[in-house]
């Protein structure tokens, strides 16, 4: 009985395939597209890093970053402000991922920026790796952060000096 039923189902399936004419046009036509909503323009300042850094603190950090040579180029306060707003007109190139991770980790520990800073940098493609010219990923930044927790990177004392100055206000 089961065999007959199985044969019956197979015949139905074969009949349904044979009875449906293939129309080339029907395959190419996309299904009804839903109207894409216009992107909503949000006014105000974007703050993905949840930065609470003041203009004076940004200037101090610029000195720190330039003295420690965290990036391959010298930066100015406008660049760092744009970095924290994820509105860079280009990208920064890391000179030392471990130093960058150490700085960002310290800023996060003292609640100057969000704990999720790695995702913000990766998702917004803000920094290129020094050697491979590819954007730093969350994984790259996570590895660098884990590494600096065990072995301080060369130049960490420069960052610590400026972090202490930040805390003094």
Predicted segment positions?
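Flexible coil/loop and intrinsically disordered linker positions at secondary-structure junctions
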Residues: 5-169
């Amino acid at each position: 009985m089961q065999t007959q039923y199985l044969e019956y189902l197979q015949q139905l399936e074969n009949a349904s395939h044979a009875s449906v004419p293939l129309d080339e046009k029907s395959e190419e036509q996309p299904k009804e597209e839903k109207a894409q909503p216009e992107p909503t323009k949000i006014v105000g300042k974007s703050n993905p890093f949840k930065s609470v850094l003041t203009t004076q603190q940004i200037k101090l950090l610029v000195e720190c970053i330039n003295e420690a040579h965290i990036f391959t180029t010298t930066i100015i306060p406008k660049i760092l402000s744009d970095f924290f707003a994820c509105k860079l007109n280009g990208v920064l190139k890391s000179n030392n991922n471990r130093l960058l991770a150490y700085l960002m980790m310290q800023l996060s520990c003292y609640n100057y920026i969000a704990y999720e800073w790695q995702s913000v940098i990766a998702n917004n493609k803000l920094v290129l790796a020094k050697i491979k010219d590819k954007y730093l990923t969350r994984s790259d930044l996570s590895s660098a952060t884990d590494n600096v927790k065990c072995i301080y990177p060369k130049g960490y004392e420069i960052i610590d000096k400026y972090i202490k100055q930040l805390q003094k206000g």
